């Protein structure tokens, strides 16, 4: 279950990501220029895009907290899927630019061996981004936040990029100068792939793809095992940002009075919302059936 501590982490993690990405953009950019590493400069540009992506995530999480109103009766949660898509697009088009620029430099013959100091920048970047990926992934999963999960994968892409950068820098230092530019292209391929995957996930969320099966099974079992219920006609759900909305129809004895059927449905709704993670809205419909004696 999502605890108060999880919600506190949710409010803090994006600020951590924001300031860390600013720091990484600065130190990798400066170190890349001073050491002559094109791959590290490219990695710094990637971190710069991460700053923008984190701002988008910050905005979307804030807006998604707004209560449902007349204009948006199901709430503002889906803005997190839009934010996830924007993060993915930033990564994808940034990756295309990196690959294009590095390819042009190779064609022009602009390859040189960077200073060994560039290795330090790549190592620090790998460690920092992997830690931020794990931190944000935990917070994103516990809060069921697609925007924070997307931002976590943004950091994982940066960590993978830095691995490619490290390999390229080391290879260039030991006598293969073109490896630095090739590493920058490798960074672009990895980042573009993650950008595409984030957009696919965001589109699935906006298209109301069914929620995880575990959520449906837990809710189904609660409804099925409730008093006066003679079966579950159907159950379906969708993600609305961090929240899960469920629609359930149950079979009850036709001899039950209307208010009694309503009490059964209300008890099921409250039990599901209390016991199933991330479920915030449950609609329980009732279908009367004649029970054979």
Swiss-Prot record:
This bacteria has on average 16 oval magnetosomes of about 81 X 58 nm which contain membrane-bound crystals of magnetite (Fe(3)O(4)). The chain crosses the membrane at residues 13-33, 79-99, 106-126, 159-179. The C-terminal domain (CTD) forms a V-shaped, dimeric metallo-chaperone-like fold and binds 1 metal cation (probably Fe in vivo, structure determined with Zn(2+)) per subunit. The CTD is probably responsible for hetero- and homodimerization. The isolated C-terminal domain (approximately 213-293) forms homodimers. Forms heterodimers with MamM. InterPro entries: Cation_efflux (IPR002524), Cation_efflux_CTD (IPR027470), Cation_efflux_CTD_sf (IPR036837), Cation_efflux_TMD_sf (IPR027469), CDF_Transporter (IPR050291), Magnetosome_CDF_Transporter (IPR053436). Belongs to the cation diffusion facilitator (CDF) transporter (TC 2.A.4) family. It comes from the Bacteria. Residues 1-12, 100-105, 180-293 are cytoplasmic. Its main location: membrane. Residues 1-214 are annotated as: Transmembrane domain (TMD). This is Magnetosome protein MamB. Gene3D superfamilies: Cation efflux protein transmembrane domain, Cation efflux protein, cytoplasmic domain. The keyword Zinc applies. Keywords: Biomineralization, Ion transport, Iron, Iron transport, Magnetosome, Membrane, Metal-binding, Transmembrane, Transmembrane helix, Transport, Zinc. GO terms for cellular component: magnetosome membrane. Zn(2+) binds at residues 245, 247, 283. Coiled coil: none annotated. Pfam families: Cation_efflux, ZT_dimer. Residues 215-293 are annotated as: C-terminal domain (CTD). One of its GO terms (molecular function) is monoatomic cation transmembrane transporter activity. One of its GO terms (biological process) is iron ion transport. Residues 34-78, 127-158 are lumenal. It comes from Magnetospira sp. (strain QH-2). It is a multi-pass membrane protein.
